């Protein structure tokens, strides 16, 4: 009977050990399955498919969404200009390299000093001649600046913004036109274009009225949508 008791006791011990092993295996499987589910959920949340369409930059930049991007580009400036109560504009075009007289003269003096040290330099001679030509055109910078100042003062007030100066937002004549409005404490618009080598916006545009475009055609549309006049200075294309 003692032997039978020992065998029964041993059997119970083995059953207990087996149950413990099974429970451990089940716990491991459960824990492992939880980890896999958590990883899978993170992958779901991080995937592009789970992003809101308007937050998915890869989607918005795709060829298939070109129409949507064009609609956004035509709509955004229009909403801003309406909000700012811009009734009409005057477009000012001209060369990006034309600068004010003092700046042109300073560059000439700099090259002249270099030429005195290297009088045979063809490169410096060509640069000197180009700068002399720019100096002869510097009066156009002042003309654009003065015109924009007068046009802005006579047509803008707290309630109405008509004949607002609009440029490409770059340097040269564009800068001069924006500068004239700036010096008159009036609004002016800059319509920049995104290109690899395109200029940085000049610092005289009214904050909130400088727009960056990707499409040339839509930029041109916004140039003419509110325009009542266009002023063309030398240079540019």
What are these language model-derived features?
Residues 7-8:
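Polybasic, lysine-rich low-complexity intrinsically disordered segments
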Residues 16-19:
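Family-specific functional microsites
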Residues 28-33, 37-40, 44-191:
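Glycine-rich beta-alpha loop segments
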Residues 166-167, 171-233:
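Phosphate/pyrophosphate-binding betaalpha-module
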Residues 236-237:
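Short Gly/Pro-enriched loop/turn and capping motifs at secondary-structure junctions
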């Amino acid at each position: 009977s003692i032997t039978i008791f020992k065998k029964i006791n041993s059997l119970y011990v083995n059953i207990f050990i087996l149950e413990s092993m099974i429970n451990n295996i089940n716990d491991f499987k459960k824990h492992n399955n939880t980890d896999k589910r958590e990883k899978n959920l993170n992958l779901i949340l991080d995937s592009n498919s789970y992003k809101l369409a308007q937050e998915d930059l890869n989607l918005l930049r795709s060829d298939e969404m070109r129409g949507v991007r064009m609609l956004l580009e035509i709509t955004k400036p229009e909403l801003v200009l309406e909000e700012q109560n811009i009734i009409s504009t005057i477009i000012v075009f001209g060369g990006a390299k034309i600068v004010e007289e003092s700046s042109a003269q300073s560059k000439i003096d700099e090259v002249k000093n270099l030429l005195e040290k290297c009088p045979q330099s063809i490169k410096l001679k060509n640069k000197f001649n180009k700068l002399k030509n720019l100096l002869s055109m510097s009066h156009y910078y002042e003309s654009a600046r003065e015109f924009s100042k007068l046009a802005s003062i006579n047509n803008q007030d707290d309630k109405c913004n008509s004949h607002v100066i609009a440029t490409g937002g770059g340097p040269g004549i564009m800068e001069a036109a924006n500068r004239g409005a700036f010096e008159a404490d009036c609004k002016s618009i800059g319509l920049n274009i995104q290109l690899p080598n395109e200029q940085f916006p000049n610092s005289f545009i009214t904050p909130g009225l400088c727009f960056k475009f990707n499409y040339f055609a839509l930029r041109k549309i916004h140039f003419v949508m509110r325009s009542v006049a266009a002023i063309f200075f030398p240079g540019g294309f």
